[in-house]
């Protein structure tokens, strides 16, 4: 079941990468930081809506951000956003 969750995350990431427009070479050489480019929030959830054991144990919600430079403590790189930003995710804490 953990494999299914991982594959789902990879498929979601692949769709996101394909949905991003291809950057022009002029944009890639521009090094000025654009407002709102850093720390764009994305929420990703996996699991059975009926609250199965899979949802409770192995597919906790992820909180993801597109970050410039590197992921914060507790986050892992899951890919890229728009080619230049890192797609960083961490597990949401459950109470």
Swiss-Prot record:
May have microbicidal activities. Residues 1-19 form the signal peptide. It is found in: Secreted. It comes from Mus musculus. It comes from the Eukaryota. InterPro entries: Alpha-defensin (IPR016327), Alpha-defensin_N (IPR002366), Beta/alpha-defensin_C (IPR006080). Residues 22-57 are annotated as: Disordered. The keyword Lipid metabolism does not apply. The keyword RNA-binding does not apply. Residues 25-40 have a biased composition (Acidic residues). Residues 20-58 form a propeptide. One of its GO terms (cellular component) is extracellular space. Disulfide bonds join 64-89, 66-81, 71-88. This is Alpha-defensin 20.
């Amino acid at each position: 079941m953990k494999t299914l969750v991982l594959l789902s995350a990879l498929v979601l990431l692949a769709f996101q990468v394909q949905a991003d427009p291809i950057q022009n070479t002029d944009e890639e050489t521009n090094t000025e930081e654009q407002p709102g480019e850093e720390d764009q929030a994305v929420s990703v959830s996996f699991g059975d809506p009926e609250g199965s054991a899979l949802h409770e144990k192995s597919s906790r919600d992820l909180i993801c951000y597109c970050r410039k430079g590197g992921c914060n403590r507790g986050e892992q790189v899951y890919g890229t956003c728009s080619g230049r930003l890192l797609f960083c995710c961490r597990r949401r804490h459950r109470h």
